[in-house]
From Swiss-Prot:
Family from the record: Belongs to the Ntdp family.
InterPro entries membership: DUF402, FomD-like_sf, Ntdp-like, SA1684
Residues involved in Mg(2+) 1 binding: N87, D103, D107
Organism the protein comes from: Listeria welshimeri serovar 6b (strain ATCC 35897 / DSM 20650 / CCUG 15529 / CIP 8149 / NCTC 11857 / SLCC 5334 / V8)
Residue numbers annotated as active site: R23 (proton donor)
Name by which UniProt lists this protein: Nucleoside triphosphate/diphosphate phosphatase
Residues annotated as binding Mg(2+) 2: D105, D107, D120, E123
UniProt keyword terms in alphabetical order: Hydrolase, Magnesium, Metal-binding
Obligatory cofactor(s): Mg(2+)
């Protein structure tokens, strides 16, 4: 498997279950790259939606991807604290073009005070019917919602107190 090197700039591409491109983040700096974990950082990066719409992120973010879990975490560094946006999706795959994953609609938003909410359940159910997600995928996603909830409550991985300090400092050094 191809692995990007630290300091390398990569794209992140999310797809839907039907194979269609969903969204592309144009520039993310690789901060850590192993077979199991890729951590990246970006700030004011161009994002292109599948329909061609474009927008630019507003704040620095640290992105966490794992090869064993069906979620990734985008930690947004804002003036009033750290917000985590967690996408339920496949473990990452990476090649010379981009880091890639399939987005399965469900998201968890974590607020600076630790509160969190599961989002987009209606969109998930609609796409589950339209794209015929297998029951096995549904079970995996529900299990990973539970795993992610425990990580948030236990302040594990990207939710640990030192995580942002360490990786944001490295991002500022690399960019």
């Amino acid at each position: 498997m191809y692995l990007p090197k630290e300091k390398e700039i990569i794209q992140i591409k999310s797809y839907k279950h039907n194979g269609k491109l969903h969204r592309t983040w144009k520039k993310t700096v690789v901060l850590k790259s192993t077979e199991n974990i890729i951590i990246g950082g970006n700030d004011h990066t161009l994002v292109v939606e599948a329909d061609g719409r474009k927008w630019v992120t507003r704040e620095p973010s640290i992105c966490y991807f794992h090869s064993d879990y069906w979620f990734n975490v985008i930690s947004m560094i804002r003036e009033d604290g750290i917000y985590h946006y967690c996408n339920l999706g496949t473990p990452f795959a990476v090649d010379e073009q981009a880091l890639k994953y399939i987005d399965y609609d469900l998201d968890i938003k974590v607020f600076p005070d630790g509160r969190f909410h599961l989002l987009d359940e209606g969109e998930y159910e609609q796409h589950r019917r339209q794209m015929k997600y297998p029951d096995s995928i549904d079970r995996i996603l529900k299990t990973n919602v539970d795993v992610l909830s425990h990580w948030i409550l236990d302040k594990k991985g990207p939710f640990s107190p030192d995580y942002i300090d360490i990786w944001y400092e490295k991002y500022k050094e690399y960019r």
